[in-house]
Amino acid sequence: MKTQVQGSYGLRVKSPGGIIKREAECKNVITDLGMNRLGNTYWKAAEYIRVGTGTTAADPGDQQLVNQIAATNNRLGLATTDNSGAPLYRSRVTFTWQFALGAVVGNIAEIGVGWAGTGATLLTRSRILDISGLPTTISVLAGAILG
């Protein structure tokens, strides 16, 4: 049986009042560690979102962010859709996390999800990409919330 896993990130920078100031979306790389984790304890593979300033391309061999500056397990919601059925049997899971006000300030260049807030525990990693798919940063100013 052939099985595939893929994912993407959507980032929003919001004012404390909830006004969206910036959005970005990018596909991620499922790490080798992440694939092993999915095979053993998949329900605990995506507990934390982590952001950093690292600028190297994501690779399946990545185990942690290049230069992590913040992490949170403040999950606001979990939305799932049922299995799509034959012939593809697709399922979708959407997690929503939000950092506390002031927890992330600066230019974010990388993002990852893992089962812990630090260390070699990454399920996925990605660079932040612009609309053309090129590496960029997303600025989070003091007084803004990353979610």
Task: Set out the residue ranges of the language-model regions.
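Small cysteine-rich, disulfide-bonded extracellular modules of the LU/uPAR three-finger superfamily
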Residues: 1-109, 115-147
